[in-house]
Amino acid sequence: IDAARAVNYVGAGTVEFIVEQDGTAYFMEMNTRLQVEHPVTEMITGQDLVEWQLRVAFGEPLPKQQHELQIHGHALEARVYAEEPEKGFIPAIGQISYLHYPEQSDCVRVDSGIVEGDEISTYYDPMIAKLIVWGKNREAALTQMHHALGQFHVDGLGNNIAFLDRLVLCESFKNAHLDTGLIQREEESLLKPSADISVELVVSAALIELLSRQAQNPVPSNPVWQQKAFWRLNQKNSHTVQLQRNGFTLKAQFSTQDQGFVASYNGQQIEIQGQLVDAHTLALQLAGKQQKLAFSQTEQGITLFQNGQSYKFNYLKSDFNNQDEQGTENNLIAPMPGVITQVLVAANDKVKKDDVLMTLEAMKIEYSIRAPHDGIIASSYFQKGDQVKAGDELVEFQLLAEEVA
């Protein structure tokens, strides 16, 4: 209030502070609008702050004074972004091929204007939605957030849902031991998840592909033909599915039996029954347990969603390669669409490993293109101010003779 009076400000406004663990508060800034996090206040007060803002804009007084507010419980807000946490949180650009929001209730709220099929571009902030939850205390709110993130499914482009879920489960975060070094300290658990995947998930992904084939080639609607799924005269009653994950080929073999299949993968055998409930749900019985597994299926592959994490499997392609977003040894490519803000090298320049060659900016994030080794710049294809697309070759790079040797 004193800050607003000091500048003769009249109207709706919010003041931001940084608060230490001991309660010491430091002024940050004042905005002439609501904050992005205003739903947190709405959840614990039961007030509609957007209505308040409109009333104040019309010259009306605040509907309630501070002492009239009643604070109940604890609320948290997570911003679901199209970004790549494991790659420095760079924005992810593309079309959302599948989008499923958590079920909303008095304890779970989703604020978003994004729908399935929308394009995330370089021209706007890549936020997909705000997910706000309420609980009677911080522990209950964290549990609610974990459950809600587990129901939030996005496919078609990178996103931070899995990162947010790992953060919610992080002991430092759960105990509110928060500072700007948290992510760096917890890098191994937050940004470098294990590449290991359970046999059950591999077999489930393969079963989805197998059942999808059957759905695309249905048998006649005669009860006789429905008694043995996949039965073929004079052929082995088994089927092989191959998928790729993280550059490795995964091969699962299914043998039909009276009830479901026996799946063989990596030397293990598992009895499994499954049915596609709809385009995004697999009902299965695995290891004696019945469960439902959410998934998304595109021309490129299958993504499974389980407990806030997503697991992507690609269909087998003969031309599959493991080239990363930085390109090969001899070229460097744009990791995302954006504008070239600096070009720091020219043809024939000698550079050292990790030297910054140029910088690229998209959606308020600057990304540095660095030399992978000591070498020489053969060509630089763009100038400052040029717009580039993801995958555009930016620099042709040659290793020094001693590096090659």
Which residue ranges define each predicted feature?
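Active-site phosphate-binding and catalytic loops of NTP-dependent enzymes
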Residues: A4-G11, G59-H67, Q291-K292
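Conserved metal-phosphate-binding beta-hairpin within the catalytic cores
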Residues: Y9-Q35
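Catalytic cores of soluble metabolic enzymes centered on carboxylation/carboxyl-transfer
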Residues: I18, Q35, P39-Q269, A390-E396, ...
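C-terminal amphipathic alpha-helical interaction region
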Residues: G267-Q268, F305-Q306, A347, D355
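A conserved acidic, glycine/proline-rich C-terminal tail/linker
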Residues: I270-G288
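Catalytic P-loop NTP-binding/switch module of NTPases
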Residues: S296, Q300-A334
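Structured functional modules or segments
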Residues: N322-A405
